[in-house]
Amino acid sequence: MVTLSIAKLNSLPKEERNRIYLTLVPRSIFEHFRINPKTLLNEHGERVVQGIFPTDENLGCIEVKYRHGDKDCIFSCQVSLEAFMQSLHLDFVIINDPSSERYDIDVDEFGRDTLFGTRSRNIPEEIRAMQAGLAPGMVRKGLHLMREFVKCLEIFTGELNLKTITNRGLFYHSAILWEKYGFTYFKGLKVMEQIDKEFRPGGLLFERLDGSTPFRRKGAEQTVRLRSWAIYDGLYADALDEEWESPIMYKMVGKNFEVNTFPDQIY
């Protein structure tokens, strides 16, 4: 079968192109937020599904909002082609509950984009988000649709006649969640296993949970989410003298790898 590049997909007639891209969006989103999957209009008559489909690039982005003028999307996803593994690469996916409280962790006190904490941070908002049960990188609560989304991602991958999906676990908790949905590691498995070992009593990460910051409190080793906040706060770099590097992960369409680098985990 001939692989359909994303650039070629973007060049298809609009109706066919849109049909294929819409397979990325969990059906539950259309149903819950009363968005017509054919007209792409919400109950207020606003077009709330948009995309970016450059015909000269192997990438595409689709997003869904609750109201047209909303700052945050309900759903936003960008995919591209990974030439090395001949796979579909998931650049990012964001799924927000628009009715939940917003935490401005994405902008600092000067209004600059924090770039997921790589350029700057908004500590007060991060503390609020953590206390509300959110993980690093989240501005709102999610909709618990990741399992459904992975199925959508597999359908989309099949439309391109590809068999492999790749992505990066941007945060520690992201990698753990991708494990749960059938992904394994191309790069980073040993690091993830080491992290679990060092978070156990007597480990280097465990010993650094000293309460020196709100993100490094004792007991944080017990959950995926609090481990992730501690690593995001620089605990990994401080304890192991090396920077956290997002693992590269992959999944075969129709196959779930049974990987679990945090046995008996609590999210």
Regions found by a protein language model. Give the residues of each.
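Short His-Asn-centered micro-motif
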Residues: 167-170
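Conserved acetyl-CoA pyrophosphate-binding loop and the N-cap/start of the following alpha-helix
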Residues: 141-152
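Non-catalytic substrate-recognition and accessory regions of acyl/acetyltransferase enzymes
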Residues: 1-138, 155, 159-160, 164, ...
